[in-house]
Amino acid sequence: DVWDAFNQLQTYKDEIGDLFNTNAALVVSDGFTARVGSLTANAERMLPWRTIANEDDRPRLQMELETVVRGFFKPELFLDYVRHFVLFEQDGDHIAKKVAGYHQFHAVREAVRATVIAAQDVGKSVLEVHEERATYGKEVQPGSRKAGVVWHTPGSGKSITMACHAG
């Protein structure tokens, strides 16, 4: 099962840790079920990747592994992920690598788009947003300086979301 794959990678990490020095994210799968997390994540922080490009294209009957391959590893999304959604946190002598979950990834991408639109001067298109927005609620007005709020349930990673948005 998927947790056998997770345990196998933990063994590799312990025995040949240098192999993982440049690892951005860890994907474990049994060929159907798949989870994405960081190299230092425990099993509870290994989460499914539920979408391809945004919340509107969430596959219903697709294997989780296919969703990870088509969504998480889509080149332009993966490069954005590696650049903006991999974080490090020091806890004493230990450095933990943390990565955003799919919900954080898509929420931050939408929040950044909304922020860019709300921050631009009306009549000037210095900042252009080339991707179609996935809108939640009212449209963001250019120049309004009002970009909205990202809402998460308790324990779902608001700190990571805000760090990625600010970063």
Predicted regions and their residues:
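ATP-dependent helicase/translocase motor core
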Residues: 1-167
